[in-house]
Design a protein with these regions (language model features):
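C-terminal transmembrane helical hairpin of 12-TM major facilitator-type secondary transporters
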Residues: 317-367
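Intracellular juxtamembrane helix-capping segments at the cytosolic ends
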Residues: 121-134, 362-376
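Helix-to-loop junctions at the C-terminal end of transmembrane segments
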Residues: 64-78, 308-322, 406
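Intracellular loop-helix junctions on the cytosolic face of multi-pass helical membrane proteins
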Residues: 1-11, 103-110, 121-122, 126, ...
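Helix-loop boundary and gating motifs at the non-cytosolic
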Residues: 2-57, 249-254, 258-283
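Loop-to-transmembrane helix entry/capping segments in MFS-fold secondary transporters
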Residues: 46-47, 136-146, 292, 375-387
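Hydrophobic core of transmembrane alpha-helices in multi-pass small-molecule transporters
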Residues: 95-99, 103-122, 348-362
Length: 462
């Protein structure tokens, strides 16, 4: 359906179509706050954590562009995007359930690969559905609601271990060799969250069929069966890369620095807090479990800030545009990370996460607003997948290189890794200034043109 013909949806319709994101992000939040401690409990060396995190970017790089391209060319009685997030949520819930019960490092790593493949299968269709169902004026709101869901899910995930601890659930790690029950039960609750939220979106949201359904089905039949669609998906991806708008190519440089830095946060934030604020550098230290759980609190602070920013972002974007919003908010995140070097006080460390949350709200929203403003409607899925590739490639580079300099350049200190993340954010903000104006949503460029015309008319009168 042409974007100009798409009806205005109510807030609750937009809410319902994104509600499944809540459960998916609860799963991601559990992973981000607990995976490094889980790996450490199972015997992983701190300097090798980056390699163990490879599953996320590799599965994202391989799966999201393919799912985007296939779903662009799919229509079933269940819809275009819904079959994919149904499959992803169901398989992901199994991995979430089994992950904390891993008895060996190889088992946890294997389940991590399954979990991230499932999450990536589910996540891209949610992003693409905003482009499918919302017109230009409502897309900023649509992605802001998804930002709220991302933050809400991750807040719940970060808070859950401490809530369970307050209810009397054990945090005993048996000398640093056992995953505590507060982590295990948090993951079990995550399964329920994923399935319930996914079912809600599935039953409350319909998708628009292709404009000419018979012609669309004929085109799909010509592509053959499943393997034929896979082949055409790779062809569509390659053509999309060749035809990629200049604005999207410039976004790549912002993503390069942002997402080279971000893995440091997931890999080392909990460990940095345990080491510097709780004097617990290793899993057998007395306060390690408590310190690592405060990593979850740090993510709560970040995501509460992101929730607040979700309500403010549409107004900020309207006032200064997407490019400047992106740059300013990234600088806030960079300052937050770098400031952690100045204190070991847990309250001040958590306060630094406010700046990170401000930046995170832009990272998970602004690029998608830009992309849907400049790519063809019928190729939104494949370009959303390619946008995720922009995320994955820097992460893979991070995971493969950190081990070479963690003990030398970063002096084996997880806090120094967070400072490097902050520097990357500042460099990404500089790159924002080189993104062309064509990425601005149409309603913003229309406002700018009207203001320029008014200024011209005023000058003529003078």
């Amino acid at each position: 359906m042409n974007t100009s013909k798409k009806p205005m949806l109510s807030f609750w319709q937009i809410w319902n179509m994104s509600f499944g994101f809540l459960g998916i992000q609860y799963g991601f939040g559990l992973q981000q706050a607990n995976l490094s401690p889980i790996f450490r409990y199972l015997g992983a060396d701190e300097s090798k954590l980056a390699v163990l995190w490879l599953a996320g970017p590799v599965t994202g790089l391989l799966i999201q562009p393919i799912i985007g391209a296939i779903s662009d060319g799919t229509w079933t009685r269940f819809g275009r995007r819904k079959p994919f997030f149904l499959i992803g949520a169901l398989t992901g819930s199994v991995a979430v359930l089994l992950m904390p019960y891993s008895s060996a490092l190889w088992m946890a790593v294997g389940l991590f690969w399954i979990l991230d493949a499932s999450m990536n299968t589910a996540m891209e269709p949610y992003r693409a559905m905003v482009g499918d169902k919302l017109n230009d004026k409502q897309r900023t709101l649509g992605f802001s609601v998804q930002t709220f869901m991302i933050a809400g899910g991750q807040i719940a995930a970060g808070f859950m271990p401490l809530l369970l601890l307050s209810l009397g659930v054990s945090d005993d790690t048996q000398g640093g060799k056992h995953i505590p029950n507060i982590v295990k039960y948090s993951f079990v609750i995550g399964v329920v969250a994923m399935l319930v939220s996914m079912a809600w979106t599935n039953f409350t949201t319909d998708e628009y069929p292709p404009d000419n359904l018979e012609e669309f089905r004929a085109e799909q039949a010509a592509k053959g069966g499943f393997f034929g669609k896979i082949g055409h998906a790779f062809k569509d991806i390659w053509e999309a890369v060749i035809d990629m708008p200049q604005g999207l190519r410039r976004i790549w440089w912002v993503k390069l620095f942002t997402w080279y830095g971000l893995p440091f946060m997931w890999q080392y934030l909990s460990l940095s807090i345990a080491r510097h604020s709780f004097n617990a550098p290793t899993p057998d230290s007395p306060n390690f479990a408590e310190g690592a759980s405060y990593g979850g609190i740090a993510f709560i602070v970040m995501n509460v800030t992101t929730v607040v920013m979700a309500f403010l972002l549409p107004s900020i974007v309207k006032a200064i545009g997407t490019r400047m919003t992106y740059a300013v908010l990234l600088v806030c995140g960079g300052i937050g990370f770098i400031s952690m070097l100045l204190t070991t006080n847990i309250t001040l460390v958590l306060s630094c996460m406010i700046g990170v949350g401000i930046a995170w709200s832009a990272i998970i929203t602004i690029p998608f607003i830009m992309t849907t403003s400049i790519v063809p409607q019928k190729r939104i899925g494949v370009y959303m997948g390619l946008l995720n590739a922009f995320i994955c490639i820097p992460q893979i580079f991070n995971n493969l290189t950190v081990g070479f300099y963690y003990d030398t350049l970063l002096k084996g200190d997880p806090r120094n890794a967070l400072v490097l993340c902050g520097i990357c954010f500042i460099l990404a903000a500089v790159c924002c200034l080189f993104i062309p104006k064509t990425v601005e949503p149409k309603y913003i460029t229309e406002i700018d043109e009207q203001e320029e015309n008014l200024q011209g008319d005023f000058a003529a009168v003078k």
